[in-house]
């Protein structure tokens, strides 16, 4: 008891630690990648096709979740072979409350290898709302060290319903002698187990069973039920060891065990120990070995205010008690409070040292709750016993005689059967056949064997499907006129098996599917109302109703939003399929014309554009003398069109906006004085500027070209672009006069401005030498004919230098008289007369002939 209290405390502690987990794992929608499909509902369960999908169930423990296997699942590659193996789904604080349908598929490669722990199995704990059915679990081994409690291949603890589950663990379940509540299928069962079996050896400590470690009952709301189930593996343990159940309360019906059972105390071929148990139509063929309270069917039936019962059951295995002391019975070792009725034992008993040995019951205790035996027998030949008062001994021949049992009131119509030279056996089992016509997919549930009078949970839909129909249950008549069973109903999901084979026919109801109309991004109006149509009925496609989508024209309906599916025009028809249909309004975008009014500019071609799209800006038009300023949406040019953001929404005209060009008119004066440039609009005239000035030139007007061929008329010509007007000049012709200053006359000449003039023949002037021409009267600035140019009417002045002559005196034989120099027209002083011997000087003469005298006082020098 101390150990059990410790386990209870540990379970409570685990519950506290994991309470938060339950908060975060209540009912909710799973991500689409977590399972192979489905929505987790009864009608559309989550689909499990991989080990990862199975592992994800632990995240969806809440009530209302439904799961279904769609293929065999191999855990071999998923589990680390050197690791702890499978981690149980859920625990006592977070129980599995959903429904999982194995659909007849197998989970293979399962193993558990842990150092400690409680609530060990594929599931940790199956809750009161949980259901696991139609599943096969095979694996290598289950081992847990230490002192684990609540260990079973399927679940450590069951509060829900287990139906049609089979387990086969190759190397069995092996736990320490300190373990407790160990079963091949379930550690402890508070719920219901139907039509299930285990083919595995189980080795544990206390409360060890081939199917269930403990089948519990609290006499109130929860009664452990085992129905039509069996275990075929060998079972060994310490105390309370049974081929089917180690410690049993509740109800066990139509079940059996065939494996050998070995333990110490309370060891039985079917049940180790029991209290408040009802065993009906069950048996064991196990060889049983123990040291105290050892029975071919039950080790002991303990004292309790509520009585136990064993009816219509038998044991035929060998029972051995190798030690001394203890109780040994072919059916029950020790019976304190059990009522045994219509049951028998026929196995060999070896218990020479036992305290109490009986062919049927070893010890029948007395007192207020003592057990009773009625119409029950044992084979005195095979058991080697002959005790009475706790079962009637019969010979082997009598035990194989039907009358022996009929005389005792045994029911050979409903329960028992007997063949020649054999012991009575249960004639309880009948075949339940499922039949389903017109299946398109899946398998009809396999035939089931059920005992007469047992409650049968009908199979669910499994993987059966019929196109366009929903499974609505089973009926005993093909046309549905018989009894109806609904596997998903809490009330009409079962029946009591009668004394005949039974066939159930799948019933199908034709599906109705919605045809929904989606406006598909419409802007206003209303789509047609959703229609509900029977499978394969004709659907008439309506028009758009009042739907409007701005800028689009309705073209019909499509099964895909993007138009990639089936297209229907209003008035078309189609056959309703197997899924709801959404028809999406199809819209063809309107194409509008965009014209360009260039307002006097070059032509721009119109373009077509879809509604709501931008258009590419065309090449700007051209208009002489104008600058293009963009396109506008209105004739008044108040609202500009933005080609990046503005969208076409109708047929439209864009209007060109122009800004008249302002041009610069420059004046090239061609060497004249500068004339300022002016600004002028295209097409306007300009005011003639003040004429420029240019030395030596006369301004002859402005011209449009450098070659001065096209004159600009300021009255009529207009500006059409940036331009330069060029000044035209006519070079001046000037008169050059020659003032010879007393010399001979020199003719004037005409010459152009800045030109050189040819030097004229020098003038002559008596007694003078010509010294050049000068620009001024004062003769200070000489004129250089080679470099100086004419810049205006002018007079050049001759410069003269008076001649200086040498006057020589020829004395004609007289004394020498020095010559003198004298300017032209000057008087010379008379020199001292010369002397000539013998002569008188008379005077000087101008000529050798001495005819013309020189008068020094008045004759001026004019020539030499």
From Swiss-Prot:
Gene3D superfamilies: 2.160.20.110, Listeria-Bacteroides repeat domain
Compositional bias annotation for Polar residues: 383-395
Keyword set includes Ribosomal protein: no
Region (Disordered): 372-399
Subcellular localization, as worded in the UniProt entry: Cell membrane
Membrane topology annotation: Single-pass membrane protein
Main location per the UniProt record: membrane
Keyword terms: Cell membrane, Membrane, Transmembrane, Transmembrane helix
Stored Pfam families: Flg_new (PF09479), Glug (PF07581)
Keyword Transmembrane in annotation: yes
Recorded GO CC terms: plasma membrane
Family matches, as InterPro entries: GLUG (IPR011493), InlB-like_B-rpt (IPR013378), Listeria/Bacterioides_rpt_sf (IPR042229)
Transmembrane feature ranges: 7-27
NCBIfam families: List_Bact_rpt (TIGR02543)
Protein name as catalogued: Putative Gly-rich membrane protein Bcell_0380
Organism: Evansella cellulosilytica (strain ATCC 21833 / DSM 2522 / FERM P-1141 / JCM 9156 / N-4) (Bacillus cellulosilyticus)
